[in-house]
Structure formats: C-alpha cells, structure tokens
Amino acid sequence: MDVNPTLLFLKVPAQNAISTTFPYTGDPPYSHGTGTGYTMDTVNRTHQYSEKGKWTTNTETGAPQLNPIDGPLPEDNEPSGYAQTDCVLEAMAFLEESHPGIFENSCLETMEVVQQTRVDKLTQGRQTYDWTLNRNQPAATALANTIEVFRSNGLTANESGRLIDFLKDVMESMDKEEIEITTHFQRKRRVRDNMTKKMVTQRTIGKKKQRVNKRSYLIRALTLNTMTKDAERGKLKRRAIATPGMQIRGFVYFVETLARSICEKLEQSGLPVGGNEKKAKLANVVRKMMTNSQDTELSFTITGDNTKWNENQNPRMFLAMITYITKNQPEWFRNILSIAPIMFSNKMARLGKGYMFESKRMKLRTQIPAEMLASIDLKYFNESTRKKIEKIRPLLIDGTASLSPGMMMGMFNMLSTVLGVSILNLGQKKYTKTTYWWDGLQSSDDFALIVNAPNHEGIQAGVDRFYRTCKLVGINMSKKKSYINKTGTFEFTSFFYRYGFVANFSMELPSFGVSGINESADMSIGVTVIKNNMINNDLGPATAQMALQLFIKDYRYTYRCHRGDTQIQTRRSFELKKLWEQTQSKAGLLVSDGGPNLYNIRNLHIPEVCLKWELMDEDYQGRLCNPLNPFVSHKEIESVNNAVVMPAHGPAKSMEYDAVATTHSWIPKRNRSILNTSQRGILEDEQMYQKCCNLFEKFFPSSSYRRPVGISSMVEAMVSRARIDARIDFESGRIKKEEFSEIMKICSTIEELRRQK
C-alpha cells in the first residue's frame, strides 16, 4: 500500500515536524588532507576584523601583534573586534550590582579549587599539542613529557602533585635562557629478512637530546596547534579548531572554573547545565517576560546569531574582566588567573601539516611543510591560496602565525558567556531608564533576546540599543541571521520553544544503532538510548517499540547472531544452531548467542544478563559469567560504564549504561601496525605508565587509596607501604621470618638504587 507522506503530518502541529528538516541522517562530512588552509583563513579573518588596531612587536619572540582594544568605535553591520575596556568594566560593575557578592563568592570557591586541584586534572581531554615533539599527543602523554623535561631542567615544584605547583614550574621555565628536551626520531635501514630473503626496511626509534633557546621555547609554549573540525553537519566549508599545549591548559582551567562558578549563579546563562535542567532554566526566563507583558506590553523574541564570536573576542578584554572580578582578592590569586589571557594575547597558531602537491604527469607527490610557506615561490599555488599566503607572511615565525586578537574555538566558553550575560543584564528597566526592557539567554556564542515594550517602535528601539551595546564589548549580532518573532516561538542552542520546548528528535538520530564496542556493551547502550529518548525526547511507546525491533535486527546483522531456529546462513550459524539444540531453556540464551529478544519498552532498564538469568541453563550461566574464562580480558567490573554517543551536533556526549561483565565484554587488542612507526617510542612510554600505575594500585587497593599528600614519590610511598604491610603480616604470623627479612632487603635495595640514580 502506498502511503502519502503528507498524511503523516495532518495531525502533527507544524512546529513538531521541524525535526524532519534537519540534516542529521547519514554520515556526517569528515575532512581530509591538511587544515593549513582553514587555519590561515582564521588568522587572516581575525586580523581583518581588528585591522584598525595598533601594531606592536613582542620583545621576547619578535612576533608582530595587533591590538584592537579601545580602537575606533565600531561601524554598523561590519563585524569588528574593537571592544572598549571601560564599557566592559562598566558592564561587569552593573552585573555585580544586580547580583550582590557574586564575584566575591565565586572567587572564594575557585580559590579552594585552585589549592586542591591535582596535576592529573590535565590528563583529561583528548589530543593535546605536545611542545616537546611539536605535534599532537594524548593528554596524559603530553603532560608526562612536559613534566619529564621540566624535571631534567631542574624544575621540581611539580613533584608535590598540585596543579598550582606545576604552574609555578611553567612560569619559571619561561625565564630560563635555554631548555633541554628529548625528542624522538627514527632511523631507517635496509636489511635482508632471514626468513624470506627479501630486503626490508627496518625502522629504529632513537631519542636525542636537543637544546632550545628562550625564544624558541616561548614560541612553543604559546603555540596552539590547529586541526580541522570534523563531522560538522549543515556546513559547506570546514573550519579550524585549536588544541593548546600543556603550558596554557592549567591556567585556562582555573579561569574557566571561576567563570563556571559565576555562570551557575546567573539565571540567563545556558552553561554549565544541560538537558532538562537547561530547559527548565530557559522556560523560567520566558515565563517571567510573558507574565509581565500580558496586558499592556508587546513581547518579542530574537533567535540570535553572532557573527564570528571567537574571532572578535579579545584576550585583553578577558584580562580586564578578570582584573575586575578578582579586585579585592589576594595577589597570588589575581596573578594566577591573569596569566591565561596574557598568554592568549601572545599566542601563536601552528599552521598544521602544510600543503601536498602532486604532479599528475610524473606521478610525484611532495609535501610542503608549513615552515616553508614563508619563503617558497608562490607561483606553484592557485590564486586563492596565493592571496592567503601573501596576507599571512608578515605574521609567520617558524611555521607558526602570530595571532594576538581573537580567541580560537572553545577555549573560554564560560567566561565569554559571562560577558554576554552582562549585556543581557543591562536590559532591566532601572538601566534602560525608558519604556522598553529586555532579558534573554546566553550560552557561549548562542543567544535568545526577549524584548518587551508598549509598542512596536519601543521594541525596535530596544533591539537597536541591545545591538549597539553589544558592539561596544566586541559582540557582533548578525542582522542577517537573527530573526524576531512574537515571544513564545524561538530557538536556542537547538532547543525549539513553542509555548514550551518541543522535542527535536532528529538530533538524537545518530545515536540510535549499534555502537561497535562489543556485544555486551552494544546491547546495553542500544536499549539505554531508547529508554533515555522516551524520558527526555517525547519518543512515544509505539515508536519506541518499533525502534527496539529495528535495533535488535540491526544488532543481529552486525554480530551475525540470528536466532538459532532461523533460516539465515552466516559464518556463525553453524555454532549458534549447535548451541540452540543443546540448550534446554532457549529463552535464557542471550541475543548475541542466538537467543530470542525478551526486551520490551517496560524492561529497558534491566541489563540483558539479569533479565534472562533465571531462564538460563546452569552450565550456560557458568560459561557466561566465569571470570577465569581465558577469552575475556576483564576490566575491573564497574556497575556503570560510560559510552560516548554522538548527538547530531555539539560534542560527543557521555552516557551511562549498566555494565554486567560476561564473556561477551571483550576488549579488542591494539592494532599492531603502530609498532613499526615513529609512534612506537610513545607507545612504550604509555605502557610504562600503565605498568607503574597498576603496580601502584597493587600497593594501595582502592579502599585505602587516598591521594598522596606531601612530596613523597610513588616509589617512596610503595616502599614505605610494603614495610608497614610486611611488619603487620609478620607480627600476626601470616608470613615467616625469612620472607619478612627478604622483603626488608628488597626495600633497602630499591632505596639504595634511587640514591645512586
């Protein structure tokens, strides 16, 4: 039977059908090749928006820097970065006046965090620019390399394990005349393979020491590496994002902690909350505006869009904000918070891999690294690239571009939200001193503005005043991309509001399906996603039931585990049929072992193993949940695991699901091809850390494991722990005298070795 698709929508209010127009099915676009072009675009655009500023030269690095602050007053419609310091400070003062004590309290909270945060906070996060190797690394490795270099250069404050002490080392490292680093390099040589008698290339990894002078070190410390942002839907052009190095990260973390603490106290801030909590916050603001406008006033809402938010923000402005926010605080605290914006005013953008050239005729490919862009003849490039390079050349130093104005993506989300909210705060009648007034919501660069006034002229005047006020602090509302509507219908951070929030279900579409972790996790994640969407996103019972059936079908095709009594032939069907026939209680077999599906929308919260446990044959139970089963490399069994699900846009979300460890919870082994690359040295380092940490946990089981206080090293802590445990075990008769003295001897030997080293 043919279904006319328009019939589906006859009963659906138009606004609920909005989600069908979103570009969220199918694979998102990924970038290929280098991000060099996108990064040059960002650098050139940022300078263009601030071009009327003052040029200066950094005395330490020689980098040319553009400062647009307090430059000419901005022109209408043209995005610009000419923020006025006094306007920003005044906005902060009014924000404090409307929220007495907000800055004071947030500073106190942050001070406590600063004193307690451990340096391992910096191991969170994915790729990080590793300045010692001049490329990206996992955060933990980059941190370890930095600390290793610091220690070999006599910077040892970090040994206390506190982040603030590590940052002291960072500050000191910038005063050193030179720094010695260890870099990895690889040698290739041709050797004859004994087995096959063929010539093969053998690679060996070496480590070599290298001295870096103060100028080069500062450039590296201030460098943000750039990459292309992947998987962005609904855009034709890709764009560049930045990953800062370890020197900057710690300082940024403290600034964002302070800003987060302020945002939590601001009703107009869409950060740091998310999900239903955010919706409730938004609904409150809308309710307030609508209640006040019922009889006499008109109320309109702008779904706002800002032009190039990051590229018009300025670190110098953030410095002014921080100086104001921390005005009565101790000197050390003010200093530590002002370092991040100062580093950002002196930042350098690394241009990435450079360009790849190929000659079709001679079948040749060659890579032009970013370092060469300053000197290469431009005749090889096409016109648009030539223009980019010409423009960026005066800014280049060692393959990085000096980028003083602008804030690269995602660095100070919280602090820039505080700036946005401070302008929304000025909409109160006591500040506008006229008949119109405004309020709204701000979440990083996204905003919604609600304006109330007695008539249309008043609304227009209110919007104009808001627009101009924003301009004074470097926020550029886009007149082309923002639209105004009667209050009650607007969009904010992809939440659609129509007298209440309508579920934008298409956003969740990419997270339905089989994740591809392993059979156990995938089943659990799949049903949890459906459950969560029933709770949060208006997924109705009939649709959920259908989603469940589609998921099970998808799952069976992915893992080739069709029911034991099916006719479908796959690689696994012979084994699964055999199992089916041997099993008495067939309902007890897991879906991944060819069993039936017992899930329906009422029991999605129960892990499959628990759901079927009572139905399983005893020997099947024994095989399934046997910790000695050699095929399972068991992680510690946690009752809750975290999966990364991809919503349609925004960052990947972490989602909790129940984890029951069975023989289906396997962990795939690492791809071996990495062992032949220059990454190998890094991999060996990582394995060493892994071993050390495992050993440490053996000495300090989690029940007794407190973060080490004081400055004893891991080795010292383990030795003293071993001695205490040995004495207790010896005195209670659990170990013999010989064993006791042997342990003591080993401990002394270890200490002796450490002293010699």
Curated annotation (Swiss-Prot):
Keyword Chaperone: no
Annotated region (Promoter-binding site), positions in chain: 249-256
The keyword rRNA-binding belongs to this UniProt entry's keyword annotation: no
PTM entry text: Phosphorylated by host PRKCA.
Keywords in alphabetical order: Eukaryotic host gene expression shutoff by virus, Eukaryotic host transcription shutoff by virus, Host cytoplasm, Host gene expression shutoff by virus, Host nucleus, Host-virus interaction, Inhibition of host RNA polymerase II by virus, Nucleotide-binding, Nucleotidyltransferase, Phosphoprotein, RNA-directed RNA polymerase, Transferase, Viral RNA replication, Viral transcription
Domain RdRp catalytic: 286-483
Domain of life where this protein originates: Viruses
Placement of sequence motif Nuclear localization signal: 187-195, 203-216
Primary localization: host cell
GO molecular function ontology, one term from the record: nucleotide binding
Gene Ontology terms describing biological process: DNA-templated transcription; symbiont-mediated suppression of host gene expression; symbiont-mediated suppression of host mRNA transcription via inhibition of RNA polymerase II activity; viral RNA genome replication; viral transcription
Cellular localisation: Host nucleus; Host cytoplasm
PROSITE patterns listed in its UniProt record: RDRP_SSRNA_NEG_SEG
Reactions catalysed according to its record: RNA(n) + a ribonucleoside 5'-triphosphate = RNA(n+1) + diphosphate
Composition bias, Polar residues: 55-64
Enzyme Commission code: 2.7.7.48
Gene Ontology CC, one term: host cell nucleus
Stored HAMAP family: INFV_RDRP
Functional description taken from the UniProt entry: RNA-dependent RNA polymerase which is responsible for replication and transcription of virus RNA segments. The transcription of viral mRNAs occurs by a unique mechanism called cap-snatching. 5' methylated caps of cellular mRNAs are cleaved after 10-13 nucleotides by PA. In turn, these short capped RNAs are used as primers by PB1 for transcription of viral mRNAs. During virus replication, PB1 initiates RNA synthesis and copy vRNA into complementary RNA (cRNA) which in turn serves as a template for the production of more vRNAs.
Protein name: RNA-directed RNA polymerase catalytic subunit
Organism this protein belongs to: Influenza A virus (strain A/Memphis/4/1980 H3N2)
Taxonomic lineage: Viruses, Riboviria, Orthornavirae, Negarnaviricota, Polyploviricotina
